[in-house]
């Protein structure tokens, strides 16, 4: 899709990968960038506004773990103001296997609920125009970091959800693809808890291997947005953007 003159909602658009991606999106000239984030960061919002004064950047506080009804209410406020939204980016995520319920709530349920909520406004069966969902998942959805099985499983679940809704596009009019970053230099990976403390040095060990910067990831994210391939499974690793071919071992046949 062409980002210029589009309306974009970015959940967690002020995080590590999120903020650099917001910067790259703003440079591409959307009409509106609506940032939904749990933590308010006025300085970051001001920076985004200054980066391209032609873009209207708006912030709303949002915790993806709220009930579905609250998410729908917030989206109604946004749609009432913008009338149309072209792209929803779901980017909320935590990495802490000591917080099992919250990891699942943020990394998986939050993605499902926000996507489900926007269907009220996009689903062509309800007279909607359709739209595009970009879900930030992880390479751990391909192969887990086994020391953080809860995080890895939550990202695998988000990836599975995304590939499923992509296949429903002919019914709903809503397309989807997944963004799967490799190990990226963010606060998230500098220190985190393994499951049951099976490996206290997991973050340190992980960072001994090659990583990528948030800017590299963000620039490739924008390329994936522009490619706009329904059902694509994008790997953003070591500064590269690659489409993954998923190996099929079983098919429901329906």
Swiss-Prot record:
SUPFAM superfamilies: NAD(P)-binding Rossmann-fold domains. One of its GO terms (biological process) is alcohol metabolic process. Its EC number is 1.1.1.1. NAD(+) binds at residues 10-33. Substrate binds at residue 138. GO terms for cellular component: cytoplasm. Keywords: NAD, Oxidoreductase. InterPro entries: ADH_Drosophila-type, NAD(P)-bd_dom_sf, Sc_DH/Rdtase_CS, SDR_fam. It holds the Pfam family adh_short. It is an enzyme of class 1 (oxidoreductase). It catalyses: a primary alcohol + NAD(+) = an aldehyde + NADH + H(+); a secondary alcohol + NAD(+) = a ketone + NADH + H(+). It comes from the Eukaryota. The keyword Protein transport does not apply. The active site is at residue 151. One of its GO terms (molecular function) is alcohol dehydrogenase (NAD+) activity. Belongs to the short-chain dehydrogenases/reductases (SDR) family. Homodimer. This is Alcohol dehydrogenase. The gene is Adh.
